[in-house]
Amino acid sequence: MPKLAGVIIAKTIEEAVKKIKLHEADLYELRVDYLESMENIELLLPHSNKLIVTVRKVEEGGAKRIEEQERLKLFEKFAKIKPAYFDVELYSNIVEDVINLSSKIGSKVILSYHNFSKTPSYQTLQSILDSMIELEPDIIKIVTYARDFRDNIEVIKLYENSENLIAFCMGEKGKISRIFSALYSPFTYVSIDNSVAPGQFTVGEMRKILELLGETK
């Protein structure tokens, strides 16, 4: 069955660990921008090989505004547990710093782009993808908002010429692209309790869909 990454929204590290233990997934994206306390990071060590550390900037869906240098300090703080992945935005002043940090500690890089208002044209998306490829990340993530069902096609077409790509549309009209992404991406994102992004499936919903499609272990 395709891999699923459960999105962890928590106020404390203890709460995050509890959610990881309660909900079975292949990977877990820890949204550091939602944390109110950074104490006891070491509690995540037993799960670090399944952890995606994300400090999302507010312009791309982050929970709160965090200055770029402060975001970099948070990435450096979580580098102590050597997570499987760091997720950093293409359009970020610290993108190269995070890529270098990941290289030093042996973590992989997810280079991401999010547009919460629309889906740009295929040509624009391809240009963004080309810029991301130049930075040689391990995985590229492109997420847009579907205003129309046809927006799914613009995003899905990106798979024609790219490997290690995660691309889908948010919103009710973008759900079909999430299913496509689950089938053709290294992994796809699901919620484990409350949905973080519009149109996001839960772990149970996505597993059921994949079973119906014959994608079983």
Curated annotation (Swiss-Prot):
GO molecular function term, any single one: 3-dehydroquinate dehydratase activity
CDD domains in alphabetical order: DHQase_I
Residues that bind 3-dehydroquinate: 29-31, 56, 178, 200
Pfam families named among the record's database cross-references: DHquinase_I
EC number assigned by the record: 4.2.1.10
Leading EC class: lyase
Pathway assigned to this chain's UniProt record: Metabolic intermediate biosynthesis; chorismate biosynthesis; chorismate from D-erythrose 4-phosphate and phosphoenolpyruvate: step 3/7
Keyword Lyase: yes
One GO biological process term: chorismate biosynthetic process
Highest taxon of source: Archaea
Family under the similarity heading: Belongs to the type-I 3-dehydroquinase family.
Function: Involved in the third step of the chorismate pathway, which leads to the biosynthesis of aromatic amino acids. Catalyzes the cis-dehydration of 3-dehydroquinate (DHQ) and introduces the first double bond of the aromatic ring to yield 3-dehydroshikimate.
Protein name according to UniProt: 3-dehydroquinate dehydratase
Organism taxonomic ancestry: Archaea, Methanobacteriati, Methanobacteriota, Thermococci, Thermococcales
Gene giving rise to this polypeptide: aroD
